[in-house]
Amino acid sequence: KSYIKKKYNKPGSVFLGVIHRLDRPTSGVVIFARTSKALTRINQQFKDRETQKKYWAIVDESFDSNSGTLTHWLKRNSNINKSYAHRLEIIDSKKGILHYKKIKNLNRYCVLEITLETGRHHQIRSQLSFVGYPIKGDLKYNAKRSNPDHSIDLHARSLTIFHPTTKVIMTIIAKPPIKPQWNFALSD
């Protein structure tokens, strides 16, 4: 808030609203609103599914297909902060849909680009684990081992929204963390 107050020469208190979140061990794009009106308008875009979120994930094993769609029913267990994917709808489950495209094959891993159609709790982590491809370092969702820094190799690569006042399409892109696994995964 102090940065915004100084940069925009704001008198009095400064508004800063969190529009969306990332799982704690995930890296990438997070956006904030500087006004309550912008917060309301962008939240409505998320509610109406007018936003587009792309993620990069390094997954255990070499993913079988080059692209596809995963559709599951996700049920959240708040007691252990985990969501479970199911093939069929069950009580209190929500439909989760994601699209994936293989970016690169590595020796024991591959890099996927994931586009979310729905935004459910731990959706990417749960669905990829359910089909046998947990995210590297994600012990909660069956990865073989943790990363040394306890992060997981899931990165919120980009977020596309409409500017809350001008309605211009904006795409915010975040570079992956400077870590050996990402450097190796994305090198040519």
Language model segments and positions:
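RNA pseudouridine synthases
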Residues: 1-188
